Design a protein with these regions (language model features):
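Acidic, metal-ligating active-site segments
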Residues: 94-139
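Glycine-rich oxoanion-binding loops at beta->alpha junctions
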Residues: 125-148, 152-155, 161
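Long, contiguous domain-sized segments
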Residues: 1-79, 84, 146-173, 178-317
Length: 318
């Protein structure tokens, strides 16, 4: 069905006006949010205690939790080792469609593997898999959709990374394009990959593989969620609903761009708190890093397993 461009065009002036008002409101709210963030710089223990109390009381919560560094930490990212194996995975998929005469689904996983410092060319491989016929239907007998196929793809990426990492020369850094872990959604309860994901993470940990997820256009608002929770009276915690928070639209990257002004600098390390619709098999930490090559900050988010903090050999390479 084609778009009614005339109808859209007639609404553009009003839409532009409302969007400008929205952006103005965000710009006015941002200094107050930054002031809250800076004021809590050294209160890491108190912040953790408040968030952990909320975790114990709430069924649903999604926010950042500081680990140990002050909130205003900004430091140069560690240098990579002289020689290491870098493995990165990215995937794509074809979703079943009831308008096709034959139903099928395809999972595509691309791997690039490079031995840095060796002088050899990177190796590229592609693994393409058809979903089995029984995998195309959900428990109700309907065709699976984008969410379910994305879970199959995400799991295939992690499995391919594990297989490549176990055969690679150490030290190994394994990168996922996007979030580090698979978040099990209620929309696809039949695809419970959590047990298998735990096994993958355990094998990577036993091998000492430095695994990380790289998000190059982060839009998460985990820090503003954290600040909103912290300013909720403890007597009101039991009824707290982060979906009803008053301030939305200021991402972590937008907030921290004031702090990470030098290319190569990273932020403090935070822990991902996730309870509710998005279930995870892994305790994930993350930081933001300025990857800009110029004067304007461009922030990416790097996620990694919490266990890497406890190993000096891994901690200095994350």
């Amino acid at each position: 069905m084609p778009v009614n461009y005339h109808q859209i065009e007639s609404r553009l002036p009003e839409y532009g006006k409302r969007m400008k008002e929205f952006e103005t409101a965000l710009a006015q709210a941002e200094p107050a949010l930054w002031e809250q963030f800076t004021r809590l710089d050294e209160d890491v223990a108190a912040l953790r205690a408040k968030i952990e109390k909320a975790e114990a009381q709430l069924r649903r919560l999604y926010c950042a939790k500081p680990v140990s560094e002050p909130l205003l930490t900004h430091k140069a990212a560690p240098l990579p080792p002289a020689g290491y194996t870098l493995i990165a995975a990215d995937g794509s998929q074809i979703v079943p469609n009831r308008h096709r005469p034959v139903q099928f689904g395809v999972i595509n996983v691309g791997l690039i593997q490079a031995r840095l410092g060796s002088g050899t060319a990177p190796e590229v491989s592609i693994q393409s898999t058809l979903l089995d016929p029984e995998e195309l239907l959900n428990p109700e007998g309907n065709l699976i959709g984008e969410d379910e196929v994305a879970l199959y793809r995400d799991f295939a990426e992690r499995r391919a990374l594990l297989e490549a990492a176990l055969a690679a020369q150490a030290p190994v850094i394994a990168l996922t394009d996007g979030l580090l872990d698979i978040y099990q959604q209620y929309s696809a309860p039949q695809l419970n990959f959590q047990a298998d994901m735990r096994k993958i993470h355990q094998q990577l940990e036993a091998r000492g593989v430095i695994s990380a997820g790289y998000v190059d256009k982060p839009g998460a608002e985990m820090l503003s969620r954290m600040l909103d929770l912290l300013h909720t009276p403890e007597t009101d915690l039991i009824a707290y609903d982060d979906q009803k928070r008053s301030l939305r639209g200021i991402s972590d990257a937008r907030l921290l761009a004031k702090l990470l002004t030098v290319p190569g600098e990273r932020s403090a390390v935070f822990e991902t708190v996730s309870k509710g619709a998005a279930q995870t098999s892994l305790k994930v930490h993350f930081y933001y890093i300025n990857i800009s090559l110029g004067n304007t900050p461009y922030l990416a988010r790097v996620e990694f397993p919490a266990w890497q903090i406890g190993r000096a050999s891994c901690r200095e390479r994350v």
